[in-house]
Swiss-Prot record:
Keyword line: Amino-acid biosynthesis, Aromatic amino acid biosynthesis, NAD, Oxidoreductase
Organism: Methanococcus maripaludis (strain C5 / ATCC BAA-1333)
Protein name: 3-dehydroquinate synthase
EC number in record: 1.4.1.24
GO MF term set: 3-dehydroquinate synthase activity; dehydroquinate synthase activity; NAD binding
Broad enzyme group: oxidoreductase
Amino acid sequence: MKFGWIKTTGTDSEERMESVKDALESSIPGLMVEKEEISSVRELGNIKIVSDSLDADVVLINKGEDLEILKSAKLSGKETAVYVEINTKDDEVYATEVSKLDFVDYVVLEGSDWTIIPLENIIADLFGEEIKIVSVVTNVKDAEAAYEILEKGVDGVVLIPEDINEVKDFSKLIERMNSESLKLDYATVTKIEPVGSGDRVCIDTCSMMEMGEGMLIGSYSRGMFLVHSETVENPYVATRPFRVNAGPVHAYILCPENKTKYLSDLKAGDKVLVVNKNGETRESIIGRVKIEKRPLFLVEAEYNGENLRTILQNAETIRLVGEDGKPVSVVDLKVGTKVLIKPDENARHFGMAIKETIVEK
């Protein structure tokens, strides 16, 4: 997962607190602040604080300072970081060496005359190490370049914003860098039938979804159906663009990092994956999960000779995504209708993808 921090800017404390507010409002994961301002920042909101103080969440020292400080911080349960200005080859060597110490979590790299080459060298030297590499930049364009260097890119970026309006753009960039791109395909409906009543799950998120977005749900791990959000206007009930009426309690849902959960296990505060018809994804936070007894509908579909199934509520407002990329109500499904799915060759064990033969039917 890519992450980003903002380094507070301003000539006085009041200006710096304004940049803290901007970071909080933009959901930036962390802030690099002066140690004298840690308590003031904590009063404004809950955010990871990086500073040269044992009161910070990430204890930071500069190159040349006593590494024993970080050892002590690590023993007390803190994360640790070393800040290195890259001006010479010796600085590169130091950054690489300090990154291999088991009590250092982050190496933060800043270049006074920045080029990509030193960063490429350090990323290559540290390939396979557990250290998180963080680059310091002054604009979103350079942040994007840092995230993509040598395809792997840095793990994080510290933005020192020259324009405060870039903070929101930086937040959007972090979200985009963490979005997974999934390969979706079409399966052909072979059977639709009512199966009686059961406990079905509605997922109410903290995000507004758009037309073409929903969540991947299914009875089988090898093929999940794109269940559309309640964004479609209809004459019976108001739209609920934050909601996916997902299916019964037993069904799988695809979550971030290619993990699955049972719908019955979801709760407020969990993160789920919102997926659009093109396979583009974003994370969303669950605000509420509702489990209610409702009439259910079995949907079977064939994909590459395999039979896939899911069960959905039998209601006009429940939709899959059809061949034209538009939502199609379950009551309008027919044998031969094409619907979007995500095929998967892997089985699942506690939500993790594994190579194992499992029969699901």
